[in-house]
Curated annotation (Swiss-Prot):
Keywords: Fibrinolytic toxin, Hemostasis impairing toxin, Metalloenzyme inhibitor, Metalloprotease inhibitor, Protease inhibitor, Secreted, Signal, Toxin. Potent competitive inhibitor of metallo-carboxypeptidases CPA1, CPA2, CPB, CPN, and TAF1a. Also inhibits human CPA4. Accelerates fibrinolysis in vitro and may contribute to the maintenance of host blood liquidity during feeding. Gene3D superfamilies: Anthopleurin-A (2.20.20.10), Carboxypeptidase inhibitor, N-terminal domain (3.30.1680.50). This is Carboxypeptidase inhibitor. It is found in: Secreted. Disulfide bonds: none annotated. One of its GO terms (cellular component) is extracellular region. It comes from Rhipicephalus bursa (Tick).
């Protein structure tokens, strides 16, 4: 039991450090996206993403705003301003967790 205490302390410290850095990108008002979804000109150097920190205001279309196109009858939170980019019979949905 005594040997697990130092291991627990190291893990706890690492988690606190990671969580303090994890919010840097988001706390600045940006978002984490895969490299393939964030063009070079929208990428930022803030930390906290396992992917890349992206200036979401520079992105356009449903996917660029973090949504996905779904049929009109699908229940979701709709980004109405981006639904036109989905095409006829589709709407832009974001999933709230």
């Amino acid at each position: 039991m005594a040997a697990t205490l130092p291991v627990f302390a190291v893990v706890f410290f690492a988690m606190v450090l990671a969580s303090s850095q994890a919010n840097e990108c988001v706390s600045k008002g940006f978002g984490c996206l895969p490299q393939s979804d964030c063009p070079q000109e929208a990428r930022l150097s803030y930390g906290g993403c396992s992917t890349v920190c992206c200036d979401l205001s520079k992105l356009t279309g449903c996917k660029g705003k973090g949504g996905e196109c779904n049929p009109l009858d699908r229940q979701c939170k709709e980004l109405q301003a981006e639904s036109a980019s989905c095409g006829k019979g589709q709407k832009c949905c974001v999933w709230l967790h």
